[in-house]
Structures are given as C-alpha cells and as structure tokens.
Regions:
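Flexible, glycine-rich beta-alpha linker
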Residues: 1-5, 26-51, 73, 107
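Active-site Tyr-X1-5-Lys
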Residues: 2-33, 56-60
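Short, conserved glycine- and acidic-residue-centered signature motifs
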Residues: 9, 48, 150
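Short, contiguous clusters of charged residues that form electrostatic/catalytic patches at enzyme active sites
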Residues: 15, 53, 84-88
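C-terminal substrate-binding subdomain of Rossmann-fold SDR/epimerase-dehydratase oxidoreductases
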Residues: 59-203
Length: 203
C-alpha cells in the first residue's frame, strides 16, 4: 500500500503503533495489538459516500444508483465477521494467551472468493432488493486516486486465533438487505439483529 491516501493512512498508523510498541510496551509485556478489517458492510450504516448506504438510499427513494469506481476489487465482509475476530483477539489479549513473540498486528477479512468488484456488489444489492433493472450510472471522481485492488492476508488470524470468516458473500448481501428493508418498513431491527447474531454464532 501507500500509493493512495487510504492505504498510506493505514500503513502510517501501523508504523506509529509499531514504534510505540517497541519503545514503551514490549518490555512491560503489555497486551496490545492492532486489528484491521476489510470493507465492512451490514445493517445500520447510514454514513454518506459509502457504497452500500448510498445504494440502499437510492433503491429506497427509487433514484439512480451512482458508483464511482466499478472495477475496483475490495475484500467485502459482514460486520459480524469483523466483530467476532475482534472479540476473539480481545479475549486472548486479556487472558494473555498469545505468544509474546508474535507481531501484534492482525487482519480480519474475507476469504479470497469474497473479494469482488464494486459493480458486482452493487448489482447483488440491487438484485436482492428486488429491482434487477434499476439504473446504474458510473460517475468517476477526478479528485483523488484509488487503488484498484485492496485485500487482506488473514492466515495469521486463522492459525493463531482459530478464527475464520463464516458467511458466504450471498449471506452477507442477504443479511445487509434484510436489515435495511426491515428498518425502512418499520419492523423491529433489534430483533432481526439478534436473529442474525444467533445464526452467525451457530454457523
């Protein structure tokens, strides 16, 4: 990374953490780590200029879907995948169950087959919403550079934490659309969230 603002900011954060860890914390055996996730999606995200919330808002209001970088490949994952990794890591840190020689940087991302292009995710969201022919317009931004490919190596988390992603990409899309549909129709999203958590935890 480092050729665009996004990846360079992540690399800078890791370097800063590493310098503090080796300078102040390593000798004290302090349980500390950094954790990075992929492109997290799921219900409850309404932030502006994010692919999934923007697509959902367009579908809900029956407006054209605009996408900026359709051929960019991203490591898509549901928020429950990310949180499960963070919780496992946190438990290991609290109980000091990690080998102190392991570098304390962790990636929690999807399996490689879940790394898909933006246009694939957008069309999948549209299909799951039930609007297969919804209009999409590509609106390229000239303001900044974006990497064509972002990915995460999750081998260490699998090996050292016995963590792995459990949801297929189809399930991730279904969970996401189901949550937003429930929200916009006034249904109990807390109950649905609990159902999704229960499904995930028993998968």
């Amino acid at each position: 990374g480092g050729l665009d603002n996004y990846s360079s900011s992540k690399a800078s954060a890791e370097l800063l953490f590493k310098s503090y860890f080796h300078s102040y914390f390593r000798k004290n055996y302090l349980s500390i780590a950094t954790a990075r996730a992929g492109n997290v999606i799921g219900g409850g995200d309404f932030k502006k200029d994010r692919i999934v919330p923007d697509v959902i808002k367009s579908l809900q209001s029956n407006k054209v879907v605009f996408i900026r970088n359709p051929n960019a490949t991203r490591p898509w994952q549901h928020i429950l995948e990310t949180l499960s990794g963070y919780l496992i890591l946190g438990e290991k840190l609290i109980n000091k169950k990690l080998n102190s020689k392991i570098i304390p940087n962790w990636n929690f991302g999807p399996n490689r087959k879940n790394c898909k292009k933006v246009k694939f995710i957008v069309q999948s969201l549209i299909n799951e919403w039930g609007e297969k022919n919804h209009k999409i317009i590509i609106k390229k931004s000239k303001n900044f550079h974006e990497s064509k490919l972002l990915s995460l190596n999750i081998d260490k988390a699998k090996k050292e934490l016995s963590w792995k992603p459990n949801l297929t990409l189809n399930e991730t899309i279904e969970f996401t659309v189901d949550w937003y549909k429930s929200f916009f129709t006034g249904n109990d999203v807390e109950d649905l969230s609990n159902q999704q958590i229960n499904y995930y935890s028993h998968k």
